[in-house]
């Protein structure tokens, strides 16, 4: 479990290392009090150079999955770096469910009405999860990280 409630003020972030690259993260109530942009970074590197950013922009009312720094992205000029969806907040809150494994990220919101699915190519050691808020405050509450079973492991 990452945190029951994680308030962030100003330009700030918090980072936790996941035990492996398989994970399930839910944030039942992400409240964007005054932050211009807030979200989480999955499959991040220790130095912060690599990571897949999932964030909400309050001005444009959009949810973005940005994989422009998600590891090896130079294999094709057709590689799309960002996927952006219009997603108005409900009562100032956004509920996300994020599934992450070795090479994919799936983001569910709106009770499954909106889904973003992308492939990512980080190094095996890029296994950190961070939350951040830019230019204001955001609260991540009821946030949990659950380790999923490795499908290659013998049962």
Regions found by a protein language model. Name each.
Residues 1-155:
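Beta-rich accessory regions
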